[in-house]
């Protein structure tokens, strides 16, 4: 099994593309959902965030106030690094758990939906393939204005706050161009799924695990039949 990192930009159509992959039966892990999950009350990251930033980051029900926390780390590299040092290990741990579940179920590849895949670069080394859902800037701007009922100025500000899609496209191994008709984009997704599904890149890990399991079974057989004393 291998990992596929998928990202996009605001109003690029990433969520719609993810839905198509899921309809095709693909395994998808949303890293944003994991990030929200691991900071819930009762989890280690929640306790460490409160210890590091104080009870002012808590809502009345004990949940983390994401807006307050975001304001605290805004333009504060040291605080942002501290928060990342708390959350990233827990995110990776949960991500690996979910990935292993899909491995046991026989999936050949798993898609990781990672909004900041190229910005943080922390998970890039684990990705066998990277995919960007792209659209040209004019299309992105028009979609964002229509979807969020924004002025042109506000929409442009939101787009400028992100790494440009054209830069992400240059860094990605695969680009799904969602600038035109949705039927064309959907066809690209289907073709990419077929390419990934028929790839043999999943074999090394699966063979390695099977070899390891065979070794353990063989060792247990030797222990029970030849090396351990009979009762």
Swiss-Prot record:
InterPro entries the record matches: Depp_CoAkinase, P-loop_NTPase
The UniProt record lists the keyword Signal: no
Transmembrane parts of this sequence: none
Keywords for the protein's UniProt record, in alphabetical order: ATP-binding, Nucleotide-binding
GO molecular function: ATP binding; dephospho-CoA kinase activity
Residues in DPCK domain copies: 3-207
Signal peptide range: none
List of residues binding ATP: 8-15
Superkingdom assignment: Eukaryota
Biological process, per Gene Ontology: coenzyme A biosynthetic process
HAMAP family linked: Dephospho_CoA_kinase
Family according to the record: Belongs to the CoaE family.
Protein name, UniProt field: Dephospho-CoA kinase domain-containing protein
Organism: Bos taurus (Bovine)
Gene name linked to the record: DCAKD
